[in-house]
């Protein structure tokens, strides 16, 4: 069967593209390697969402705001709240399980079709244009045709395998941003954590200029514990090449995402290197416990 639009990747970028195309009258197929939608936000513990605002002005709206509104309506997000570290203007905590359900519903309402547990295997090009892709799933290898193909793989796999010129890493040495394996902690005493930070602002110098904002903002997000981190590294209990703990509340009571591991000098587009990075990520997560 041929679709008007075939989208490789069911993360939020792929999902919003799918919804927009289907609402415009196109037949849409989303090819997703996991058993659920949401990409890094649901599969990798990435959160909160960021960059909806630049200062006071909201710069991301449309379908993404629809998703946030739907999450809020079901109690799965507090919506946009101030970033107490002020890296960005606002952050948007959310429930990953809730986002999976919202995306399922939105794509079905729009008339999109989804193939879960399906991997892109080959890109078939004719006269300089993609004519079809070969995918692999429980049915084996089979070909999917489309009028338009959208690369929402996250790594540009569709574009790269079609022969497009790709740029990866810094021009001078090819180095890319370190990889991270997030870990989620539950049962955290938020009031005790917040009280400690407010009682020792000198130990959380990145928060210090915004301590009043931190005092009134929920859920809690912070960066700190530099001294404890340094001591653990000196004692050989941590092998992580960063300086502190970075953590974000998800909005669920006592639940936090620690964005603190750091896997350097590995390549997420190389199968062997990526496999080693997975091992190192789990090792670093265990060190944090």
What are these regions (language model features)?
Residues 6-8, 17-18, 22, 128:
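Membrane-embedded transmembrane-helix bundle of lipid-linked glycan/lipid transferases
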């Amino acid at each position: 069967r041929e679709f008007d639009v075939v989208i490789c990747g069911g993360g939020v970028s792929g999902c919003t593209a799918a919804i927009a195309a289907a609402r415009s009258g196109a037949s849409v197929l989303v090819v997703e390697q996991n058993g659920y939608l949401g990409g890094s936000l649901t599969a990798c513990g990435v959160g909160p969402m960021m960059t909806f605002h630049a200062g006071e002005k909201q710069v991301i709206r449309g379908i993404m705001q629809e998703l946030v509104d739907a999450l809020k309506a079901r109690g799965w997000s507090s919506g946009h709240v101030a970033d107490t570290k002020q890296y960005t203007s606002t952050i948007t905590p959310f429930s990953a399980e809730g986002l999976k359900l919202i995306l399922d519903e939105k794509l079905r309402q729009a008339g999109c079709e989804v193939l879960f547990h399906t991997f892109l295997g080959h890109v078939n090009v004719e006269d300089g244009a993609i004519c079809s892709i070969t995918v692999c799933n429980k049915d084996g290898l089979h070909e999917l045709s489309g009028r338009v193909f959208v690369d929402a793989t996250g790594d540009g796999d569709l574009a790269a395998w079609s022969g497009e010129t790709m740029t990866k890493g810094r021009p001078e040495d090819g180095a890319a941003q370190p990889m991270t394996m997030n870990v989620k902690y539950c049962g955290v005493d938020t009031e005790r954590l917040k009280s400690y930070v407010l009682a020792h602002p000198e130990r959380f110098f990145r928060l210090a200029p915004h301590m009043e904002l931190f005092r009134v903002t929920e859920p809690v997000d912070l960066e700190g514990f530099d001294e404890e981190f340094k001591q653990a590294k000196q004692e050989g209990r941590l092998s992580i090449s960063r300086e502190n703990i970075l953590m974000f509340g998800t909005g669920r009571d006592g639940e936090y995402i620690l964005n603190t591991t750091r896997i350097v000098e590995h390549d997420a587009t190389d199968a062997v290197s990526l496999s080693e990075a997975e091992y190192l990520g789990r090792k670093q997560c265990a060190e944090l416990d």
